[in-house]
Amino acid sequence: MLTAESRLLTLRRCRVTRQNQLALKSIVWILCLVPLVVLAYRAATGNLSANPISFLTNWLGQWTFRLLLATLALTPFRVLFGISWQISLRRLLGLFTFFYACLHFSVWILVDHFFNWDQMVVDIVKRRYITVGMLALALLVPLALTSTKGMVKRLGGVNWRRLHRLVFVIGMLAALHFLWLAKKGRTDQYLYAAILAMLLGIRVLDAVRRILRKRRQAHGAGMSALVRRSS
């Protein structure tokens, strides 16, 4: 039987072919649509709780944040386990995050407020959880619009990466949205915030590690050059 270490080594050496990549993305597509199918089934069977509007809004909002966390988890997964084939799923998960965020927003506009623009403006200004939620959605828009390979080439790799670092800000805004919105007695918002903090912490530690390694390499190269000159 394979040990956990040998299974990890196998995953690290695994090269995803084009066929396997398409199969993997197809599976992710299906999994990302499952929450929507479940929601449609519950709506069709009249099982949306005593407050259907609140249930719809919360369901779509929670899945938006879960998909955002899944997107943010791809790089930490590579850092921790040395596995990188899952990075190819980042664009797909990011677009599904935006898709669910738009559905969440649409329910708020169409069902909750029914195009009452004056009331929506008042809510955005007065209710801080709506304020940060709207800001998070606004920041998601440029990331979704620039997710194509053509936009990466047009913006340039460096500028594109700088723009897409907004996802970290979006994650923190989403966490605040849930923390400020949650009712007393609920704990899931703290779990989401803790997961986000852990994922961002792994990224920060990895960035520090890479900076220190580059400094050591530069110092080693400088010492080698000094020794050669002195000899």
Give the location of each predicted region:
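Membrane-embedded alpha-helical bundles that constitute the cytochrome b-like, heme-associated redox core
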Residues: 2-231
